[in-house]
């Protein structure tokens, strides 16, 4: 799209919301059209730019998408599963595209998203980082070459405030590896170990989770054999990498037909 894409950001007052506002401010082809917070928030009425530390943008934080119907083309949501479903329903009814960076959806919620995406364009990805999406391609290659004769473990770490575990990114890593190897992740995943577990089953994919301090996001996939191991690691040092990816997705999405897309498609990696 040649012109600017207008975005709305829900959860504007949160850590990720403020980062998204800052990212939008610095993007040549993106313009912040609306910023939304929950009803009753003390941030309602505050200038979104001042909230994010980039100066006045003349976009005031509102407490409902209904007040911003004509102000944006794409909604960006990094909130919570229940809220994201409500926001997507709103987007369908008002013919708006949506970028979803929320993680932690259950099976029923994913089915709802699939159904809604038949009516409006949606990008949903557990991680919007370019580096992470490239990592998933590297995992396919590693699994293809080494997966059948190595022990596979996925280790991830995030800040103390993250609510879901393992992270959506870690689960996606497992899905990529399992699919490449022809395995069912639901049957081969092992989430943490405790007590006398017995000898490791080569067919399993292990997950370990760390929650500590202000870790932005660290993910490692380990392919371990006797005598050597391969580790593929991505470390995010700032939420800005996720925010910039979301803006890239929004700019790409506005010209797409209804459907459910991911960052691999946005980045042309498929």
Swiss-Prot record:
Q: What is the lineage of its organism?
A: Bacteria, Pseudomonadati, Pseudomonadota, Gammaproteobacteria, Alteromonadales
- Member of which family? Belongs to the DapB family.
Which Enzyme Commission numbers does its entry carry?
1.17.1.8
Q: What is this protein called?
A: 4-hydroxy-tetrahydrodipicolinate reductase
Compartments, as annotated in UniProt: Cytoplasm
Q: Which GO terms describe its molecular function?
A: 4-hydroxy-tetrahydrodipicolinate reductase; NAD binding; NADP binding; oxidoreductase activity, acting on CH or CH2 groups, NAD or NADP as acceptor
Q: Which gene encodes it?
A: dapB
Which InterPro entries did the record assign?
A: DapB_C, DapB_N, DapB_N_CS, DHDPR_bac, NAD(P)-bd_dom_sf
Q: Which cysteines are joined by disulfide bonds?
A: none
**Residues that coordinate or bind NAD(+):** 11-16, 37, 101-103, 125-128
Which PROSITE patterns does the entry link to?
DAPB
Q: Which UniProt keywords apply?
A: Amino-acid biosynthesis, Cytoplasm, Diaminopimelate biosynthesis, Lysine biosynthesis, NAD, NADP, Oxidoreductase
Positions contributing to (S)-2,3,4,5-tetrahydrodipicolinate binding: 159, 168-169
């Amino acid at each position: 799209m040649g012109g600017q894409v207008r975005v709305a950001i829900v959860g504007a007052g949160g850590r990720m919301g403020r980062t998204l506002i800052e990212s939008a401010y610095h993007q040549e082809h993106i313009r912040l059209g609306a910023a939304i917070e929950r009803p009753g928030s003390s941030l309602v009425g505050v200038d979104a730019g001042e909230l994010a530390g980039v100066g006045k943008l003349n976009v005031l934080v509102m407490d409902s998408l209904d007040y911003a119907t004509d102000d944006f083309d794409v909604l960006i949501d990094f909130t919570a599963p229940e809220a994201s479903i409500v926001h997507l329903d709103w987007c369908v009814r008002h013919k708006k595209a949506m970028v979803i960076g929320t993680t932690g959806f259950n099976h029923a919620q994913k089915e709802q998203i699939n159904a809604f995406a038949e009516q409006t364009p949606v990008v949903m990805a557990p991680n919007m980082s370019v580096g992470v999406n490239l990592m998933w391609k590297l995992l396919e290659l590693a699994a293809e070459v080494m997966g059948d004769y190595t022990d596979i473990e996925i280790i991830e770490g995030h800040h103390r405030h993250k609510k879901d575990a393992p992270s959506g990114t870690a689960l996606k890593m497992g899905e990529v590896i399992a699919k490449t190897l022809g395995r069912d992740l639901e049957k081969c995943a092992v989430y943490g170990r405790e007590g006398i577990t017995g000898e490791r089953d080569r067919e399993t994919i292990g997950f370990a989770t760390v929650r500590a301090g202000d870790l932005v996001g660290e993910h490692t996939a380990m392919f371990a054999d006797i005598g050597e191991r391969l580790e593929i690691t991505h470390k995010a040092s700032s939420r800005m990498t996720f925010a910039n990816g979301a803006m890239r997705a929004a700019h790409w999405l506005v010209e797409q037909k209804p459907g459910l897309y991911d960052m691999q498609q946005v980045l042309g990696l498929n």
